[in-house]
Amino acid sequence: MEKVPDKSVVLLLNSGLTDTAELMKNNPPLCKRKLSRVAIMGGVVCEEEQIKLNAKGHMTPDDAANNNFDPESAEFVYEWLQSQNIPMSVLTRNAAYACKFDIGFYESLVKSDNTIGRGIRDRQRPATEHLWKAANAPSGSETRGTLPDRCTRKWFVDAYLDGIDPGKIENIWDPTLKIGTFQYDPLNVASMVRPELFVPTKITVDKTEHQVIGLSSPEPGIANADNLRKDIRDNIINALKLVSSSDQQNNTCET
């Protein structure tokens, strides 16, 4: 990061914030000098569908999964960025829920690249099955794990199945159920490279403008879900095709 121009780095954070907090604590001058924006797949505390500010007038992290992985680090990162006047863009689950992908998306990845695409599909399927079981498990159980208590069976049905409860079933990964999935990380990336596809809520903190994409369900922060879904799908498939083509060329050269 030291070698790039000042104010040229957009930091994309798609998981827990432990490493990011460590970076900012250990290298505050460097981070302040180089970062132009930090895009977080997370969420901020809201009240009555409005951003709730703390006593300092700053936004605070909510119970989003990425924030909950390491709440202390999340608190530090959100607070530090605002105190240093580094613009934040926070994309929430509301944005993801408004841009759902059906499971046919994963089959299209398999067709575009037999290795990586199949690997993505084969990891997503058990992950979705596990989430379904966790959402049905009681609070505090081993099966539920770290899944927040708000994530109940009803939550899963509403978010993934358009409110249609499948009843007692063996497997949830079934095309006939029209189950949806969410591309949290690609959405966060898209919010930076295709900003015209989003409608963020803007909030000024200490004269610095920040963005929240997906303030609430009625305000998901997406301009057109169909266009955004197509853009993400096409870019992922094109990337897989490029990788596949490159691998084939390398294999040809080696033989």
Stretches found by the model and what they are:
Residues 1-255:
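N-terminal acidic, glycine/proline-rich low-complexity segments
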